[in-house]
């Protein structure tokens, strides 16, 4: 949950959370960033795009109906 954080705070939080999730052999995680103005979502997606290029994650997608819609991002590890 990165609600209320700046993009820099969210990226720092996500970096550790993704590492911990990989160590725990989780298949995916859900990042709650909220809908708001979309700035936090955009920052999270830019960071995840970098991680995908570095092959640290397999991919990511917007949440679907019932998952949180555009207020969450699902990260496939």
Residue ranges and their predicted role:
Residues 1-77:
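Long, charged, low-complexity intrinsically disordered regions
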């Amino acid at each position: 949950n990165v609600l209320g954080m700046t993009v820099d705070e969210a990226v720092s939080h996500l970096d550790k959370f993704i590492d911990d999730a990989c160590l725990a052999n989780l298949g995916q995680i859900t990042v709650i960033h909220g809908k708001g103005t979309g700035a936090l979502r955009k920052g999270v997606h830019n960071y995840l795009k970098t991680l995908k290029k570095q092959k640290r994650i397999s991919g990511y997608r917007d949440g679907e109906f019932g998952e949180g819609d555009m207020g969450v991002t699902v990260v496939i590890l």
